[in-house]
């Protein structure tokens, strides 16, 4: 599978490296959950850098987990960062046997067992990020084609993400493909995470 992936360009923008370094970490919404436990659970979002050889470029493995159950993530993924000039394009991949790799964001021995053969591309679900001053603003690629079925209802993902060096703000909503009304996702506003630990030094140096 690795050979079928596009090669990384000869030149990579500093913005791609900056975004990758800012993403690489353990993010927690502890403060938000502490202040409003009725509406927000305490969640961690982990992004752990993959070795350069995985994509011949910059890649990340991610987990989203409840703080009380760190070994049972409710969302896992692999992400490939691609330089598109004035924007950073992030391809998203799912894991074929996701629970086999639970905890890989915290245990590098597990992370090493993830290979390109373990993942499948989530077409139409890529994210596009642009830098705006001291932050990156991102969202799912246009077209309303990142489809997710929930409770028998076909929905498309509407996603907003804002990243700084120390914070991660995100709001994911599932919208009915016919009525465009919200079916799932937060109705109380975005999740607000603060970086508790950085893994930026694990990002390959390709500049």
Curated annotation (Swiss-Prot):
Keywords: Lyase
Matches recorded under InterPro entries: CpcT/CpeT, CpcT/CpeT_sf
The EC number(s) this enzyme carries: 4.-.-.-
Pfam families: CpeT
Any GO molecular function: lyase activity
Enzyme class name: lyase
Induction pattern: Induced under green light, it is part of the cpeESTR operon.
Family note: Belongs to the CpcT/CpeT biliprotein lyase family.
Task of the protein: May attach a phycoerythrobiline (PEB) chromophore to apo-biliprotein(s).
HAMAP family reported in the protein's UniProt record: Chrphore_lyase_CpxT (MF_01460)
Protein name: Probable phycoerythrobilin lyase CpeT
Organism name: Microchaete diplosiphon (Fremyella diplosiphon)
Gene from which the chain derives: cpeT
């Amino acid at each position: 599978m690795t050979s079928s992936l596009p090669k990384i360009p000869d030149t990579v923008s500093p913005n791609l490296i900056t975004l990758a370094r800012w993403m690489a970490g353990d993010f927690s919404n502890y403060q938000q959950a502490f202040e409003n436990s009725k509406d927000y659970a305490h969640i961690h979002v982990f992004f752990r850098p993959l070795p350069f050889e995985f994509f011949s470029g910059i890649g990340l493995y991610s987990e989203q987990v409840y703080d009380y159950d760190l070994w049972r993530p409710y969302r896992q993924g692999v992400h490939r960062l691609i330089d598109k000039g004035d924007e950073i394009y992030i391809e998203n991949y799912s894991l074929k046997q996701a629970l086999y790799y639970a905890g890989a964001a915290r245990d590098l021995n597990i992370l090493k067992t993830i290979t390109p053969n373990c993942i499948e591309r989530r077409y139409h679900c890529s994210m596009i990020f642009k830098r705006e001053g001291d932050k990156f603003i991102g969202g799912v690629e246009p077209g309303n084609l990142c489809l997710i079925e929930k409770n028998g209802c076909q929905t498309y993902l509407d996603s907003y993400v804002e990243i700084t060096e120390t914070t991660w703000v995100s709001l994911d909503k599932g919208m009915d493909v016919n009525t465009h009304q919200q079916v799932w996702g937060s109705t109380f506003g975005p999740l607000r995470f603060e970086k508790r630990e950085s893994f930026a030094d694990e990002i390959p140096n390709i500049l």
